[in-house]
């Protein structure tokens, strides 16, 4: 349920975001420090609840106004120029060659969430997904895109939602949506190693009970959209869009750790992974930040890169003579020389979210 809280604190927080957005629009040369402040505010304070006006506009289904969350998501994705003519041109091409698959998935999209069904029509989903399949034939359509697209349609007007959807899939995590979903497979391997690193006891218990990291393909591929409720998912996405969707791997681990007590007394714990408990975004984010602070730089760098490009995980493959690559003390044992160690100086100017490992998430942020 959406909280309709118009308290002085939330009004003040809303004004803070609007002032940041206004300053950024008027001072385009300050984009980097402005983005830094925007991300920092999201991390420390979150976004304020929606206003009555935003809720009413969204439930019209033809609402044309962009909510505060929508404005912030567009900024974080670098979507500034809206191209309605291009979108109409794609729609006019009609059903794509993936139409039958898209049609099957549309009816499953947040079908238990009444607020979603009031705000987003199946026609909107169909138009967006078929338009994407036309515009990006190399990616086409992969199951899970429907919920990702639906999330944008819930927050943004249709044309803007499409452009954000396109930007996310092609610029933030294209490796997840190749024909062999290679980025998702890499994410599963990274999840496996990081879970072992942060909780060796739980990891060993799962290993002895039919555990396999590919069990977590659905929450990774869906970017968290497979677990309700939707209003908590939006808070997770605020975090992901601010700091990178690679953090979905860490947040999935956090969800596993929050189930720890139940898992350790269950004879078939892996059955519980078919459906995670409902999202509690603040708890998941706080635990994820704690995990991030523990990670060695080489592991974090691979985590950052894997949604964008293929990463070499062979240095971290299990040695059959030594199944414990992690030594269980918070350090990674690896004698192989590789290029995935500390970040080179030439990367210092890169405005990617990997600076967050050393900057946004330091101990002074809480």
Curated annotation (Swiss-Prot):
GO terms for biological process: cell division. PROSITE patterns: TBC_RABGAP (PS50086). Keywords: Cell cycle, Cell division, Cytoplasm, Cytoskeleton, Mitosis. SMART domains: TBC. It is found in: Cytoplasm, Cytoskeleton, Spindle. GO terms for cellular component: cytoplasm; spindle. Residues 63-244 form the Rab-GAP TBC domain. One of its GO terms (molecular function) is GTPase activator activity. Residues 332-354 have a biased composition (Acidic residues). Residues 314-366 are annotated as: Disordered. Pfam families: RabGAP-TBC (PF00566). Part of a checkpoint which monitors spindle integrity and prevents premature exit from mitosis. Belongs to the BUB2 family. This is Putative mitotic check point protein BUB2.
